[in-house]
């Protein structure tokens, strides 16, 4: 605590000194600007002012520019001059952020000329006494202020002049803040200039010492007490604390406001006290730039790193997800596709000349090729058809094939326009043209349905060999852009690093399943945006009409679901092609169930029409799991008719009649892949019978290698050779067999296992199942060429003997198992006595019947083995 006697003594000492700012420069040199009148007759004491003046005089002998801007020192040459400091002359100082300075310079807020500053000082100080003028103006932009040296009028004391200027500034400030807006603003930000008397020797430097509320006071000579410092510095603003330094030669002052610290530093620096025995030097204490974010991350890694990663992930989602959704919408709507605008008049005008030139070039190349062929092979040109006839025949053949499926195409369109849980499955064997049927002949030729189609080829996803390949393929199918696959590797390393530092995973690394789900989720958002786009237009249109109609006659606005139900063309169509039960790579098996789940959500939310195109019947199980209570609309595409197949072969082989291929193409049926292979073989030099024989041999080898193989190929092989051999014998004699007849054989019991086995064989294209009202009815050959292969294998004695013996042995095994089961039951019944005599009689008859069958089967085996062996067609035995 400071005693009252101490404060009184200090005040008395301060009053006795009677510090008066004179800043007099006598003929003997610049004396101290602060002195006690009673000590004026004493010997001059060495001060900072006299030292600076002497150094300045020595250095500036040969210099012409001795202004304060150059030297940093203001010269006061007589007693009728006074230096005042005006703060807040500039909007912001040089210590403000650089980007804010650029912004202010762009707005021309900080661009002030010295004349403008002079006018501003005169305006805030008005009215100044007559004959008073500013003789020197030194802007100090870093501290937002300026020094002004005034010429005091004769007969006016310096103290009176300074007091009058202060009163004028205060009065003008009150007038400036008279408005309510400025009065309220001044409560938060007082930006009107204030004036202070410069008591020391200001050092006008442009060093990088930016203003701070903390000032360091260095004492040259005797130090001052805290009470003396308070009395000296309090006039510039409220002080927070006065901290003595570790040495008595310095102290620290902390002001409440930055404006007060700037004024004190510029007005007190260089002041001489205690009869010249104490000189004060003031400096801003450098601001310690503490990066609290870096400090927080360094000191709290377990908390900071997950937060930073979460913020980065959120930022990435906010920035890139809208971009990706936009590109997905572009992929679906084909907004920037040439096919979308090819019918426009402007586009036709541009492309028509290009097409003409292209046709000319193509015709020239064809003409040259024909001439070369005619020279190298004379006589063949006359046998060929003209180009026009080839084109017409090709169109006729194509139209013949697709006319057979026109009713099915109309059926699919009708299902789409009905808009009742549009979940359509298009099934058919490989090479039956399912993709062309759906895209080219059903959707793309419809003006309303062609503009919103998302085509997904599942085979591109399933055959990916790495995670990055899978992500790239999926992004390409969905239009998902941009995709940063390198982030997966980086995130894994970051996850390991974070786990090593914090002991827990960051969660930044995601599995490929999660990433694919995110991609399909964003695709769902894009589909919703496209589906509801027309609804938003409808809603706005009806709202505008209702605003013009009188009250009570407003049009009812449909809900979103009702509108989509009435306008099926607004919903995109998702075509999922090559949908299978299992992927080529086992690690990608999750793709098919995930796509099924995703598409089921689209249908349930009434956002899209979904069409599955598959040749794998087993893949429907994924759809049943995704929509267990949904009845799917199904279309089955069979092979082409015999007439269409013959027309195709005649066109491809350029034949005028079918005499050459008659009898050779019937076993091929209408399977397009086999027809194309047949054409390639003939073009390579084989005759039609030779080509057919080789193809039948390959099909036979495929049957024996895959279906009649004794060992289990994979987990999906749930049949045995005896079952396949029985089907081969039945289907070689008839085009189809009834399921009820097949179910009578002991090889195809129980029924649950039989259906699973037949479904698997249908998946591998050995057979084809036909259903009547959802119930299995008939079984036919899956691939037409297999019928000829079946006949060839059965007619071969060696192969027939091998598999017939295996077939009968399997039947014997089944009967022996029955006998063993009946005998076990008889043994258990004997313990009960004669109470179940009828049951014993029944079991005895069953055992006798099975035993008779075993004897019969063994006789057949003996008969088969007694036949002489012969060499088979495969030359394997």
Swiss-Prot record:
SS bond list: none
Q: Which residues form the RRM domain?
A: 213-286
Q: Which residues lie on this side of the membrane: Mitochondrial matrix?
A: 48-302
Q: Where is the transit peptide?
A: 1-47
Q: How does it sit in the bilayer?
A: Single-pass membrane protein
From its record, what is one biological process in GO terms?
A: mitochondrial genome maintenance
- Any transmembrane segments, and where? 303-323
* GO CC annotations on file: mitochondrial inner membrane
The family line of this record is:
Belongs to the YME2 family.
Q: What does it do?
A: Plays a role in maintaining the mitochondrial genome and in controlling the mtDNA escape. Involved in the regulation of mtDNA nucleotide structure and number. May have a dispensable role in early maturation of pre-rRNA.
Q: Name the chain's protein.
A: Mitochondrial escape protein 2
Q: Per the UniProt entry, what species is this protein from, by scientific name?
A: Scheffersomyces stipitis (strain ATCC 58785 / CBS 6054 / NBRC 10063 / NRRL Y-11545) (Yeast)
Gene it is expressed from: YME2
């Amino acid at each position: 605590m400071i005693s009252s006697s101490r404060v009184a003594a200090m005040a008395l000492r301060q009053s006795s000194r009677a510090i008066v700012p004179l800043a007099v420069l006598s003929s003997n040199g610049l004396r101290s600007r602060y002195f006690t009148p009673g000590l004026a007759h004493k010997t001059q004491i060495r001060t900072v002012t006299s030292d600076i003046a002497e150094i300045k005089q020595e250095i500036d002998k040969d210099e012409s520019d001795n202004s304060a801007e150059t030297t940093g020192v203001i010269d006061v040459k007589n007693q009728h001059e006074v230096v005042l400091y005006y703060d807040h002359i500039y909007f912001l100082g040089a210590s403000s952020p650089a980007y804010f300075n650029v912004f202010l310079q762009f707005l021309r807020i900080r661009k002030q000329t010295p004349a403008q500053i002079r006018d501003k000082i005169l305006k805030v100080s008005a009215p100044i006494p007559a004959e008073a003028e500013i003789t020197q103006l030194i802007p100090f932009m870093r501290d937002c202020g300026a020094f002004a040296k005034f010429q005091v009028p004769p007969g006016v004391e310096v103290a009176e002049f300074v007091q009058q200027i202060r009163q004028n500034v205060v009065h003008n400030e009150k007038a400036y803040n008279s408005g309510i807006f400025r009065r309220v603003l001044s409560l938060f930000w007082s930006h009107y200039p204030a004036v202070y008397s410069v008591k020391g020797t200001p050092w006008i430097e442009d060093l990088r010492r930016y203003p701070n509320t903390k000032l360091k006071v260095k004492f040259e000579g005797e130090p001052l007490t805290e009470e003396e410092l308070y009395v000296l510095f309090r006039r510039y603003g409220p002080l927070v604390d006065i901290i003595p330094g570790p040495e008595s030669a310095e102290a620290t002052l902390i002001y409440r406001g930055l404006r007060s610290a700037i004024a004190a530093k510029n007005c007190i620096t260089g002041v001489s006290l205690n009869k010249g025995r104490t000189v004060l030097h003031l400096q801003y204490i450098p601001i310690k730039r503490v990066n609290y974010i870096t400090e927080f991350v360094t000191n709290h890694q377990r908390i900071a790193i997950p937060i930073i990663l979460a913020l980065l992930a959120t930022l990435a989602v906010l920035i890139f997800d809208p971009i990706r959704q936009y590109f997905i919408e572009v992929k679906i709507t084909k907004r920037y596709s040439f096919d979308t605008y090819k019918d426009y008049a402007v586009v036709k005008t541009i492309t028509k000349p290009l097409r003409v030139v292209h046709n000319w070039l193509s015709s020239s190349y064809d003409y040259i090729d024909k001439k070369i062929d005619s020279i190298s092979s004379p006589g063949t040109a006359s046998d060929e058809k003209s180009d026009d006839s080839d084109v017409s025949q090709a169109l006729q053949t194509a139209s013949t094939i697709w006319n057979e499926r026109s009713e099915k195409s109309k059926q699919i369109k009708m299902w789409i326009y009905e808009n009742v849980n549009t979940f359509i499955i298009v099934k058919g064997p490989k090479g039956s043209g399912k993709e062309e049927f759906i895209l080219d002949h059903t959707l793309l030729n419809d003006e309303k349905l062609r503009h919103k189609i998302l085509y997904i080829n599942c085979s591109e996803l399933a055959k990916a060999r790495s995670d990055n390949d899978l992500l790239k393929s999926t992004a390409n199918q969905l239009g998902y852009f941009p995709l940063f696959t390198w982030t997966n590797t980086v995130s894994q390393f970051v996850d390991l690093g974070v786990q090593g530092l914090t002991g827990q995973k960051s969660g930044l690394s995601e599995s490929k399943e999660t990433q694919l789900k995110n991609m399909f989720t964003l695709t769902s958002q894009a589909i919703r945006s496209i589906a509801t786009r027309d609804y938003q237009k409808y809603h706005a249109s009806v709202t505008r009409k209702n605003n013009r109609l009188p009250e009570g006659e407003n049009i009812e606005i449909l809900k979103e679901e009702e509108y989509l139900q009435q306008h099926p063309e607004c919903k995109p169509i998702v075509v999922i092609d090559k949908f299978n039960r299992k992927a080529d790579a086992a690690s990608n098996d999750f793709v098919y169930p995930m796509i099924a789940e995703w598409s089921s959500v689209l249908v349930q939310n009434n956002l899209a029409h979904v069409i599955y195109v598959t040749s794998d019947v087993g893949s429907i199980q994924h759809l049943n799991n995704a929509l267990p209570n949904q009845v799917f609309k199904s279309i089955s595409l069979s092979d082409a008719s015999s007439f269409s197949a013959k027309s195709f072969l005649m066109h491809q082989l350029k034949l005028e009649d079918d005499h050459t291929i008659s009898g050779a193409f019937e076993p091929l049926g209408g399977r397009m892949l086999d027809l194309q292979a047949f054409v390639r073989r003939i073009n390579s030099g084989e005759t039609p019978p030779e080509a057919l024989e080789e193809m039948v041999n390959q099909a036979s080898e495929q049957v024996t290698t895959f279906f009649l193989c004794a060992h289990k190929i994979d987990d999906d092989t749930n049949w045995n050779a005896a079952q396949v051999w029985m089907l081969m014998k039945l289907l070689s004699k008839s085009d189809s067999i009834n399921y009820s007849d097949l179910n009578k054989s002991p090889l195809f019991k129980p029924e649950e296992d039989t259906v699973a086995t037949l479904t698997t064989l249908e998946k591998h294209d050995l057979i084809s199942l036909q259903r009547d009202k959802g119930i299995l009815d008939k079984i036919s050959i899956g691939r037409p060429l297999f019928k000829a292969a079946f006949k060839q294998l059965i007619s071969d004695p060696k192969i027939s003997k091998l598999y017939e013996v295996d077939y009968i042995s399997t039947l014997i095994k089944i009967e022996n198992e029955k006998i063993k089961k009946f005998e076990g039951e008889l043994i258990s019944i004997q313990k009960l006595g004669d109470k179940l005599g009828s049951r014993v009689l029944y079991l005895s008859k069953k055992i006798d019947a099975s035993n008779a069958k075993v004897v019969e089967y063994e006789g057949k085996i003996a008969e088969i083995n007694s036949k002489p062996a012969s060499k088979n067609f495969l030359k394997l035995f």
